[in-house]
Amino acid sequence: MGVRPHDYLLQRRIARAKVLLMRAETAVVEIALSVGFQSQAHFSTVFKRLAGDSPSIWRRRALDGMHG
């Protein structure tokens, strides 16, 4: 069975958010809005469900992995 269109769009938004999160200077709320979420809270909930961590924790781990 395939992926529902809504789930596909969420996956694409989160993938784009991960790219943007690699830019440490961009606020999480700006990223949430730029990838199509109406609020940072909803973005964080969906991000954690799909990525396993909150956006802030994911960013910290990703950036630490690049430099550590």
Whereabouts are the PLM-identified features?
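Key DNA-contact positions within bacterial/archaeal DNA-binding proteins
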Residues: 41
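…primarily DNA-binding HTH/wHTH and HhH modules…
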Residues: 45-68
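Short glycine-/small-residue-rich flexible loop motifs, especially phosphate/cofactor-binding loops
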Residues: 29, 44-45
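Terminal helix-turn-helix DNA-binding modules in bacterial transcription factors
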Residues: 1-38, 60-68
